[in-house]
Amino acid sequence: MNTEEINCWGDSITEGYGSDGLTYPDVLEELTGIPVRNLGVGGEDSVDILKRSAAYGSQEEDILVIQMGDNGGWINLGQLIRQYRKLISKAGTDRYIIISSTDDPNDFEQIWGYTTEPVGLENTWYEEEFEKEFGEHLFNGRKYLIEHGLQINGLRRTETDYMRAKSGCISLQLRNPWIDNTHLNEAGYTALAHGVYEKGKELGYW
């Protein structure tokens, strides 16, 4: 099947907030050679993103990359999963990648924060549920950034990075901690794009 473009749906993470202008859709376009449309809008919740995608019309010849839910719009995870399913169904494509949250599981200021216990590279409860639902279509952004994010950018892992990894947290070298503890910087978005690219290759999308 021919691919017209890759549509990246999401909020400020997709939009690229926290970087100096480089976004993960930018890097993904370079890696794939396929036109990528950045459809991230900062501050939007999952309901807003679902509505925008539905209004966009048919995307049957496109590949979807979706990350939503960090700003709410859902009461329980089952509802968020149904919203993902509805977005995909209305788009009319079976070619999609779901990015699970890149928030740290111990960050209680964010919607996904839930434990102070060290998670490491084990799945969080919500990553496990997403994996059950979406299977091979799920890209675990948090785990990928912990394992590969620094190496992709030629950055050296520090003792602090090791400690954060044991806790299940992404290196601060991939974030802009003076802004907040949820958004990424250019290095973080670059690594995220590489992970999406690898997942797309695995699925045979490019």
Question: Which residues are covered by each model-predicted region?
Answer:
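Serine-esterase "nucleophile elbow" of acetyl-processing enzymes
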Residues: M1-G42, V47, K51-E60
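Alpha-helical cap/lid subdomain in secreted, periplasmic
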Residues: L31, L50-W206
